[in-house]
Regions:
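Short cationic/low-complexity microdomains
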Residues: 65, 98, 447-464
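Repeat-blade elements of multi-bladed beta-propeller folds
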Residues: 131-152, 166-189, 202-228, 241-271, ...
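Extended, low-complexity, intrinsically disordered tandem-repeat tracts enriched
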Residues: 3-18, 27, 34-35, 40, ...
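Low-complexity, proline/glycine-enriched flexible segments
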Residues: 1-116
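Aromatic (tryptophan-biased) beta-strands that constitute blades/sheets of beta-rich domains
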Residues: 97-134, 151, 159-167, 198-204, ...
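Short, surface-exposed beta-strand-loop junctions and turns on beta-sheet-rich folds
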Residues: 153-154, 161, 189, 279, ...
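Compositionally biased regions
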Residues: 5-11, 15, 42, 61, ...
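Short loop/turn segments that connect beta-strands within beta-propeller blades
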Residues: 156-159, 192-196, 231-235, 274-278, ...
Length: 494
């Protein structure tokens, strides 16, 4: 059984240190409060409700270990380089609006280098309030933070001041090659990433439901089975195909762009196409929607040259150059989320990690697909992959975070949030960060599972938190973007 890594938590006490009528909030013990951030210059006064705060326990504070509940999702700023989400390398990042219902996390993103030019020596946490709802995961490139709130907004990472916002509605966004690429559905446009100036805009033959950008190429998926590739600098159409899968036209299940290759699921086959020309490199049979149990095919190109695929209850290890099948693993239940890959030998925790919808976590040998161990958790409906970092595997199921030792497969701890966990956890510098539908951001000690700090916002957390250069960025349904010290929450540095 998993020991409980944290105490039962309830709503935090009233904000401390703010005079009546002041909309700033302060964590108990913090030197300075967080203000509401710069407001939109539209002449309207938006009421800002102070958030509640809960003091993080002292490191030495003992906590009772509770049994698991039966089934019912960095250093200081300017410190060591932060790795990408799920321990991946840096690169361009993407965020896409939900199609309806609960705001899900956006597609997997990877972080740019954390060095922020021009950051002042004395940095303060901040928050920025939007007029409209936020969705997805924030994106940081150089000294700007990009978020979508009906438009694309670019905020200065040091001060929280808005640099620019788009005049067009943007349901999806990708930042790459010095440009912000976005779509309002029937059209696609690009802006300068620094100044927001329009570079090009064009009409698309279909409704864009997914958008990714990399190495000068923009890849879109349109409703009705269309896939298009565009020149990032000019908007010229590079190639287009029809007949892609139409059962799962959602941002997370759309065509995937990775390292110069476009991966498309069509006619029961997984196609690997040259991203610039559309020429087929290889194809591999994975089955249509009925054959894979009514679940989308999930693809994870990996650093070892393989492409790992979850198709129904199967996990496939394919050769990245030829598409030849290296191995196949079958489980009793279907996989809803992509595989996760950790580089290195299995004896050091390397391999492929997957979790099925029953909540069983599998550690597979990347060379032959043999399962080294399997650990049951809770039934999960999350589309987010497990997270592997620093020899530990973190997986969310419902309102709980489970952490497992990657090598032996032994249960380390279970931490329960107040409601369903949103997005995926982020593990950086010995800490695990995640958001929840209980309106809270949580930061735990990654090894012990004890609560480092917790922030209650005015709404559900949306998407996956982002950690760059020791700063944690997150969005909430209270229409605020938060920039917090990853180690201390609202602690002051400088």
């Amino acid at each position: 059984p998993f020991p409980s890594g944290g105490p039962a938590v309830s709503g935090g006490p009233s904000p401390l240190g703010a005079p009546p009528g002041d909309d700033r909030v302060r964590l108990a013990g913090a030197q300075l409060p967080i203000g509401p951030g710069p407001r939109r210059s539209d002449g309207r006064q938006v009421a800002v409700r102070p958030a509640g705060w809960l003091r993080a326990p002292e490191p030495s504070a003992g906590r009772a270990l509770l049994p698991a509940v039966p089934p019912a999702p960095a250093g200081p700023p300017g410190g060591p380089a932060a790795r990408g989400v799920n321990g991946g390398p840096g690169g361009s990042a993407h965020v896409t609006a939900p199609s309806g219902g609960r705001t899900p996390g956006g597609p997997a993103v990877s972080e740019p280098p954390p060095h922020v030019p021009g950051r002042p020596e004395r940095w303060r946490p901040w928050r920025f309030r939007m007029t409209n709802d936020l969705w997805g995961t924030p994106v940081v490139v150089d000294d700007l933070l990009y978020v979508t709130s009906f438009e694309v907004h670019a905020l200065d990472v040091a001060s929280g001041k808005r640099r620019f916002k788009t005049s067009e509605v943007a349901w999806s966004m990708a930042v790459s090659s010095g440009r912000v690429h976005a779509s309002d559905g029937p059209s696609l446009f690009a802006l300068g990433a620094k100044d927001g100036a329009e570079r090009w805009k064009l009409a698309v033959d279909g409704w864009v439901y997914s958008l990714q950008a990399e190495r000068g190429t923009v890849l879109t998926g349109t409703r009705g089975g269309g896939v298009q590739a565009w020149e990032s600098a000019t908007g010229d159409l590079l190639w287009t195909i029809a007949g892609a899968q139409t059962d799962f036209e959602t941002p997370d299940a759309g065509p995937l762009l990775h390292d110069g290759t476009a991966y498309v699921w069509a006619d029961g086959q997984l196609y690997a196409l040259d991203a610039r020309t559309g020429v087929e490199r290889w194809r591999h049979p994975v089955g249509d929607s009925a054959a894979v149990g009514g679940t989308p095919v999930r693809v994870r190109p990996a650093e070892d040259g393989a492409v790992y695929v979850c198709a129904g209850s199967r996990v496939l290890g394919l050769d990245g150059n030829s598409g030849a099948e290296r191995w196949r693993f079958d489980s009793p239940a279907a996989f809803l989320s992509p595989p996760a890959f950790a580089p290195g030998p299995a004896i050091a925790g390397g391999g492929v990690y997957v979790a099925d919808y029953l909540g069983t976590v599998y550690a597979l040998d990347a060379t032959n697909g043999y399962d080294r161990w399997r650990v049951p958790t809770e039934a999960r409906s999350s589309i987010e992959p497990v997270v592997v970092a620093d020899g530990m595997v973190h997986v969310t199921s419902g309102n709980a975070l489970y952490t497992i030792d990657a090598v032996p497969g032994s249960a380390r701890y279970r931490f329960g949030a107040g409601a369903e966990i949103v997005g995926r956890p982020v593990s950086v510098d010995g800490r695990v960060h995640f958001g929840s539908a209980d309106n809270c951001l949580y930061t735990l000690d990654a090894v012990a599972g004890t609560l480092r700090w917790k922030l209650e916002t005015g709404g559900e957390i949306t998407g996956t938190p982002l950690v760059v250069g020791g700063v944690l960025y997150a969005s909430s349904k209270d229409r605020c973007v938060y920039a917090l010290d990853a180690a201390k929450g609202t602690g002051q540095h400088g």
